[in-house]
Amino acid sequence: MKPLLPERLLACLPTRRAPRLTALFVLTAIACWGEPGARGAASPSSPASAAVLPPDSNETDEPVLVPAAPPVPLPPAASPEAATTPPTSISRPSQAPAQLAPHVAPKLEAFSTWVKTHKGELSFALRDLGSGRELMSDGAGKALNPASNEKLITAAVALSELGPDFKFHVGVLGKLENGVAERLVIRGNGDPTFSYEELRGFAERLVALGLKRVAGDVLVDQSAFDDNYTPPAFEQQPGEWAAFRAPVSAVSLDRNSITLHVFPTQPGKLARVEFEPPGYVSVQGDVRTEKGKKRDHVGLTLKPHGLLLGAEVAGGIPEGDAVVHLTRRIENPEIYAGVVLKRILTTLGVVVVGDAKRGGEDEATELIGRDSVKLAELVQQLGKASDNFYAETLFKTLAAEKRGKPGSAQNAAQVELDWLKARQLGDDGLAISNGSGLYDANRVSARTFTRLLEAAYLDPIISHAYEDQLAIGGLDGTLRARFYALRGRRSVHAKTGTLNKVTALSGYVFGPEQETGVAFSILVSGISAHSEIRQRMDALVLEISDTLWAPHGSAALASR
């Protein structure tokens, strides 16, 4: 199916219960054409629209038509002060067409049979947003490992409990007199976006304020979170240095990761090796620039070196080759930002007498600081990009903000469980240990997810931000390469999930102009054939979309 509008213009169309295409709306969309960062466009620089991404990292009941069931109760409204605009009530869309379940049932039955044949488990639920009733189910109450679909819960609870306008803050504190600071303290409350470039900007601003000497230490105040930097279940893969397994801390830097850059020079000469940010990694070994080679073979081995990192590099890079970039997690973030800030200040000519250490909780005077973007924008890294680091940081932030500092994963899990229980969204077997869904940590049923999706849809405080953070089939995020035939409809808004033997997909399917809509959840456990599972999942969702988009109801469907 060809899109109704060019893809770049499609990216500008609103994602929520849109009005009909009036002349004013068309003019607005055309004006958006020239904006590379427009909402929904695939701009790699914007967290609101992730580029093409790989599947999430490391990452038998018969189908039945369910009789009428009571709608999910509306969630309690969050504080109006947390919203960017005054909240309004959210009306339910029109009820899904009566032929939806009968038309989808054969696809579901075939999928269920395939899962059973391959010794897997299935949890499936389909809920009508118009009536609030569960239309179809297959093991809907069975709690399975949800993989990154857990981020649907973390995003909803964060938006509800913290508010869409919530911002993180990072600052440098101390007392500066006559160019001398007795000490400097970096303090944060969990901002996952804080970068080396921003820290360097802080250092430059300190110099502009007149800083010439730090008589004591550069301290890092990590007190907003507890000292368990490794999220629950991450210990199941202890030797993994990939950045998706980064530790979580109140003060983080560059997502608590480092990047090796290898630049080719002349054949036979040593390649130039640099780590970013500088000053945290001690390096041994070398990489050679090679003549006549077609591919690089750069090796990087990391190991803890006290609170810092040691690195051993080896291998070669072809002459004239592109720069090699390897990003890896750090082990202990306790003083990471302090070590790097001290290094930057020294390069700027500031004398730092002391060392980088943890502490400074009693410092009250902020010299410089900055707020993050709003949570409504930041949370898109969970839905569209499936970012584990952002998810685990938000998870602990929930604990710190709602149960007091230091925030812990255990308290965060309880915040999420209490939130679900208060809204009667959970099923038996519900278990939450971490906020990202990585590893074998959580158990959630498809019915819980569809109830959650309905509750978020109807919540006037979080509804817009929650739907916006989901990937759109055929257009962006982890669904950019899936549902490509539906990109013109923009009908599938969902979250993917992948682990070794887990494949998940949960979200919304909307009819034309979102006049109808359903929440769905498909969880498959025990089968590692991800590609085939996704094809079968997508076929099921496509059938739902086609039914909602059929222009003349059952007569049109019967003629297909």
List the predicted regions and their residue ranges.
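A short glycine/serine-rich beta->alpha loop
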Residues: 139-144, 327, 436-439
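Bacterial N-terminal signal peptides
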Residues: 22-31
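Short active-site loop at a secondary-structure junction
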Residues: 137-157
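Residue-level preference for non-acidic, small/hydrophobic
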Residues: 132, 151-158, 218, 251, ...
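Small-residue-rich helix-loop
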Residues: 135-137, 395-560
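A short, well-structured edge-of-sheet supersecondary motif
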Residues: 114-138, 357
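Conserved serine DD-peptidase/penicillin-binding transpeptidase domain
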Residues: 35-39, 43-54, 59-115, 160-427, ...
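N-terminal secretory signal peptides that target proteins for export/translocation
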Residues: 1-16
